[in-house]
Amino acid sequence: MGRVTSTAPAVEVVDLVKRYPKRDSNAVDGVSFAVRRGEVFGLLGPNGAGKTTTVGVLTTRVRATSGRAVVAGADVAADPPAARARLAVVPQRPNLDQSLTARQNLLFHAAYHGVGKGERVRRADDLLERFGLGERADSKVDRVSGGQAQRLMIARALMHDPQVLFLDEPSTGLDPQARLFVRERVRDLRERGTTVLLTTHDMDEAQELCDRVGIVDHGRLLDLDTPAALVARHSDGGTVEVVVTPPEGVDDVAGAVRQALERVDGVRGTDEMPAERPAARVRATVAGDPAALLAPVAEAVASTGAVVTDVRLGRPDLEDVFISLTGRELR
């Protein structure tokens, strides 16, 4: 079979269920979604939400209990080899062969997938240059940095020209320069027509890279849309964040400020944020325009005797949506 047509979804999931023995609930509980061809799609969720199991099914590593999953036109349960030939996975943790050079890692991967010798050499040279690894091509993998290893894993995954690329936390642990480079390469892949499905806990990364995102929790898909549409649908306010210095004799200035702010009309809730002592930082989530609440917020803080040293207004973002849908409880 060739590449899927432009109208067919790159990934299609229908009523997917995965139940593990001796578990009270399904790890994946009736999830359905479709990923468009050439799209960067983010699958987000807390630890244990079911996203890893869902990706495991899509990449043929986990067998579903019921439902249907298709990747690049191949049913992952009915024809796993065909699905594996059309997809590639870049794990969060490096799994490169440390005894080989960067180039050899790419060549061996392509040979495994049946790419001819001349073509795999050409692809390796091209990908090493595209991912800024040309000068490290003949270096042993155990001598490359973490950022270089991440880039090399993505390059290796592309050696058999997959139609769908699965990225697991692609920029975790990278320095800012390496993170920026990886994100630029993901955008480049989209321009070249490769479908990318990424899982990440980095909401900024998801908001910046993804055309659409699906948020899952407790095995179910809670919502799916563009980042902007999700923010508009689930957030209608913003935040007012204040940094204060305490009056003499007050040990818990953050607690006092939070209590005062929570009595202000329009304040939905407050959180204490990290700050250098003795200062305290409190963020209030508000309904409507946060600028309209500046005066009552200032009055509330003044009533505690604390002195405001900094104020910041914030608009809702994807992280606010994520917390709104999945809660604040640690997993």
Residue spans for each PLM region:
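ABC transporter nucleotide-binding domain
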Residues: 183-287
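Conserved ABC ATPase "signature" region
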Residues: 107, 111, 118-136
